[in-house]
Amino acid sequence: MMSWWSSGANTALDEQIEKATSSSLEDIALNLEISDVIRSKTVPPKDAMRSLKKRIGHKNPNTQLSALELTDTCVKNGGQHFLVEIASREFIDNLVSLLKATGPAAVNADVRARILGLIQSWAAVTQGRVELSYIGEVYKTLQHEGFQFPPKVAVATSMIDSSAPPEWTDSDVCMRCRTPFTFTNRKHHCRNCGSCFDQQCSSKSIPLPHLGIMQPVRVDDGCYAKVTDKSRGSGGAGAGAGYDRKSPSLYSSFPHKNRSSSAMQPRSARVDDGFDEDLKKALAMSLEEVKSHSRNYAPASNGVANSGQSKVNGDSSATKTVEEEDDDLKAAIAASLADMEEQKKKHSAVLHEQTHSTEAASASTFVPPKNDYELTPVEAENINLFATLVDRLQTQPPGTILREPQIQELYDSIGTLRPKLARTYGETMSKHDTLLDLHAKLATVVRYYDRMLEERLSKAYGQRNFAGYNMHVPRQTSSPYPSLQGPSAPANVPGESFYTGQPQHDYAEPSRQPSYPPQASGAQQQFHQYAPPHQASQPSEGWQPSHTPAPAAQYAGQPPQQSTESTHSHSSAHNHQNLAAPSAPDQSLPTPTTDPAASYYFNQQQVSALQTPVSVPAEPVQSPYPNLQQQPPAQYQHSPAPQGQAQQQKPPQQPQQPYWQHSASQNTALPTNHQPWPQVPNRQSASYVQEPLPSAPQHAPQKPVVEEALIEL
């Protein structure tokens, strides 16, 4: 191919381009010849692009328009390799500079419009191709800059798809016989496929018009067979044996293409003659087919007579032959029309049967109920039209309604629709009520379902918290302290508290397990693990909900060995009730200063942490409340608290006697002198003395834990 890329070819291309653009009239034949030269890679595509760019920059507007038309033709027929050069910055930027030129260098308005139109059409057909994307970028840039483009013309992307000679591939052996290339066995390339072959496998030469190559070039045996088979197949199928004898070569009907001159020679005016010759041959072929078709429809006697007559009168005149051909052509056309009508009738009958079958099937499968009381679309439209006209009459002068016969007709027709409309309205309201009822039922079911889910969640949460305590359920007794929990009280309790007025818990009734918030679980576990029996847990005077209890490791007191199971049960129940107070500080409860009954329990002060084992005297004193027998508490050993806690403690005040409500048989005197109990290094301090055990059975069976839901349905 390098032998083609010579300076002579470039000079010839420049001459052809100059000749094609020298006139204001477009020479289509010469333009196609130049595009074939570019597509066949006879000249480098970059040189062809530069020649066109040079011609577009001419000062004559007619020359510029002709050069632009030639460039468009080459873009549509020059191949992919030429499109890459057209889409380069060198060519596109030159067009943009012509558009933006001002002053004496400004281009003509027609040239300017043609450049914009070409850029717009090229950007449309090259959309989606990466190697040609610069045209689209320039088109968008010009749009943003405010250039007025002509109306878009729909151009298919196949307009720029054209076949070009393939790129040559290299190989060390022949791609057909696998013979290695040597000094004597030279390498040759096939112009049709671009592969390497030796002299033995690529000795044939044929023109390749589909690649723009009109003179014979070297091809291998495989490509030669493919091209010749295609040409023979097209010729034999179209014209028959007689046509093959008249046109032995593929290009025999195109004499202007079988030339021995250079490729740059322009086409002559015989192009039209060749086209007419091809058209005449095609008409002759169609007439032969019509004759054979008409002979099949003709009677046998007529066929024999015609054959005899053709044998006898074989050398008849040309005019008589033309007349006979016209008659045969008319007969063939009539036969084809009759056949077409017959086929159309058959097709319509089949289509009619199919539609009837589908309609019957649809009618059998689903029959929509027909309601006589429903309004038809026409009736609804009449009602809307009547309402619209009545609204318009509100602004019209009086008497207009008398001059509008359409309103009277609509009024008469709508008056008959009142029963139907009323029935339709009634049916609609009943449907609306039914839907509302269904919606209410659904809402009720959803509410019950949500409540059931909440119950299950509360049970699961309560089981998890109880498992964390790891303790038995104590028997609940009546508490002498004001309740620090919420105002709600358990159901079915006999009496009320003296201080708060709320129902008291039964002594023998198993306690209901309350639900504690997560933040109080740690304090409750430490309290039940280390607190001694019958120790009352009361908040100190400086109580704050954010303070955390002191570590339980500082408290070394252990309960005495003689405490029974019921004593531990009683103390645990009491401690369990009082621990719920810190978890709900925001509840509306009496404060330690406002409630006189609770001031004794909340104003209890802490004493020094360095306490020694103390004992309570057994001398009773008079008390206004029913008394219980008290026994001296067991001795407890306490470890000294930190110095910071000792400084915060205050001297204890004289405590009052707590009120205890038990059975009437247990009324004894309380001790006279009250000594403060050892203070526990916790946020809650002891405020009352230890009470004696009730005379209950020592071995009473403990009731099982009954878990109840927090939310009662």
From Swiss-Prot:
Protein's UniProt name: Vacuolar protein sorting-associated protein 27
Biased amino acid composition, Low complexity: 549-578, 640-651
Annotated function: Component of the ESCRT-0 complex which is the sorting receptor for ubiquitinated cargo proteins at the multivesicular body (MVB) and recruits ESCRT-I to the MVB outer membrane.
Record-annotated VHS domain positions: 18-150
GO MF terms, alphabetically ordered: phosphatidylinositol-3-phosphate binding; ubiquitin binding; zinc ion binding
Domain observations: The FYVE domain is involved in the binding to phosphatidylinositol 3-phosphate (PtdIns(3)P) which is required for the association to endosomal membranes.
Membrane topology: Peripheral membrane protein
Gene Ontology annotations of biological process type: protein targeting to vacuole; protein transport to vacuole involved in ubiquitin-dependent protein catabolic process via the multivesicular body sorting pathway
Binding partners and assembly: Component of the ESCRT-0 complex composed of HSE1 and VPS27.
PROSITE patterns attached to this UniProt entry: UIM, VHS, ZF_FYVE
Compositional bias annotation for Polar residues: 303-320, 475-486, 535-547, 585-597, 624-638, 659-688
Residues annotated as transmembrane: none
Organism name: Pyricularia oryzae (strain 70-15 / ATCC MYA-4617 / FGSC 8958)
Sequence similarity: Belongs to the VPS27 family.
Matches recorded under InterPro entries: ENTH_VHS (IPR008942), HGS/VPS27 (IPR017073), UIM_dom (IPR003903), VHS_dom (IPR002014), Vps27_GAT-like (IPR049425), Znf_FYVE (IPR000306), Znf_FYVE-rel (IPR017455), Znf_FYVE_PHD (IPR011011)
Keyword Phosphoprotein in annotation: no
Subcellular localization: Endosome membrane
Renumbered zinc finger spans (FYVE-type): 168-228
GO CC terms, sorted: endosome membrane; ESCRT-0 complex
Key words of the record: Endosome, Membrane, Metal-binding, Repeat, Zinc, Zinc-finger
Xref: CDD domains: FYVE_spVPS27p_like (cd15735), GAT_Vps27 (cd21385), VHS_Vps27 (cd16979)
Domain of life of the source: Eukaryota
Listed Pfam families: FYVE, UIM, VHS, Vps27_GAT-like
Region Disordered, annotated ranges: 230-270, 294-326, 473-597, 612-704
